[in-house]
Amino acid sequence: METINLTQARRLALARAGLLKPEWTGMPRRATGVTRRARQAAHRVIQGFGYLQLDTVAVAGARSHAIVLLSRLEGFDPALAEALLQPGEPLFEYWGHEACWLPIKLFPVFAFRRKAFQQHPWWGDLIGQHPRMAENLTHRIREEGPLRSLDLEGRGSRGWWDLKIAKRMATALWSAGVLAIRERANFQRVYDLTERVIPACWRENALAKGDALEHLLLLGLQGHGWATTGTLVQTWRLRNEGEAIRAALARLVDKGAIVACALVDDDGRRLPGWVRPQDLELVDRLQRVRPRKDRGHRFGIGIARG
């Protein structure tokens, strides 16, 4: 079994995150203005991670996707972060780690999740319990065009409960693949029919679940550098898939795509994990990089509260 120490693992993680020698991992360094070239640089960052989470960091008063891109792309214009909320090809929004931008090539990969989410993980068989609402909502979008969450207000006869169910239904239909997110307007999702958002070439080539798991595990490992099985599972929220995950990892080992690699801590304890062979070569290159103060993970972060 290969081994890696803490310093090596930290440097590899930073490199794969685009924060150390980004040119060695194909990450861009700059994105100036709201130009096509800047947009392509942002897309390359997302491609490198496999996803970019969409969320609000309340204490920072900023969107998480903007913070991630600002920290990696010199000259990044925050206005581009908002412009990217109208992703279109080559990105789409779906459940990756959480609600994320994902490269469009991953749409076939998540077919297994769209199938599983016919029964929503939070609300159960909402579509089956309210078939008329599901049909009416889909029909309305088909006839009237894209629909925001705000557009659902005022249509029900029973006040907030109808609105609550309608908003959940839109999320459930999106999770099941009936609807897709066309864009975000003021950070609110704008729903449309999937066939009007996702090109047919991506909708018609669903991956089998086993192949999809291999793809996601390998992509997750690419983003982390070194990772435990648990970390890879959490990256894509692959809950209750233990046997399938173990089988997928075994196939990746047989293909030579990954190797078992133990992280050895300062006390000599070993934590089993995985690494891609090409990243072991990257570890050797990173050994020669002169460390900078606080470049590793041993630093503190303070938040001033006024």
Language-model-detected regions and their locations in the chain:
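Long, low-complexity intrinsically disordered regions
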Residues: 1-305
